Regions:
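Conserved P-loop NTP-binding catalytic core
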Residues: 31-37, 41, 50-103
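A generic structural motif
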Residues: 2-4, 86-90, 112-114
Length: 157
């Protein structure tokens, strides 16, 4: 996450196991932790980290406006905030990220699977390689200005 809520600089949370040997049952077969806890002082960002994960679910599965300035870092100089997510699912590396420019109401998105581009969006134009390796182009008639294009593809297929 970058320029998101109280995090001005890029912050990353890595759920890959380390060499600790305690709680081996907390590690999945693929080397990813099954869970974690966040511990820290008041107002240190614990809830913001959890919010960044919750927002992905909200943006994908419920009606939520991305262009809202409420997610913008109050200490930042930029009108954009970004969130990126990396998953390991059935041996496939999934990278999904989006950036919101609240000043000009523009969203950019990118989805990669095993480093292959699957979806790309800039503003109200997008291209998906999920169903067709040559790509299917979409324009303002298909791409919502304030919602994730990945959500649109999911609910329209």
């Amino acid at each position: 996450m970058k320029n998101f809520k109280s995090f001005k600089n890029m912050v990353s949370v890595d759920m890959t196991k380390t060499n600790y040997t305690i709680l081996p049952q907390n590690v999945a077969d693929n080397g990813v932790l099954k869970g974690c806890i966040f511990v820290g002082a008041n107002a240190s960002g614990k809830s913001t980290i959890i919010l960044s994960v919750k927002l992905l679910l909200d943006f994908l599965f419920s009606e939520r406006n991305l262009n809202s300035g409420i997610f913008l870092c109050m200490f930042g100089d930029s009108p954009t905030y970004s969130l990126a997510y990396d998953f390991l699912i059935k041996g496939h590396s999934i990278h999904y990220c989006f950036e919101v420019d609240t000043r000009i109401s523009m969203i950019s998105e990118k989805l990669l699977m095993d480093d292959y581009l699957m979806l790309e969006r800039m503003g109200v134009s997008a291209k998906s390689y999920i169903a067709d390796t040559d790509g299917i182009s979409y324009d303002e008639n298909d791409v919502g200005k304030d919602t994730l294009f990945l959500r649109t593809l999911y609910f329209n297929t």
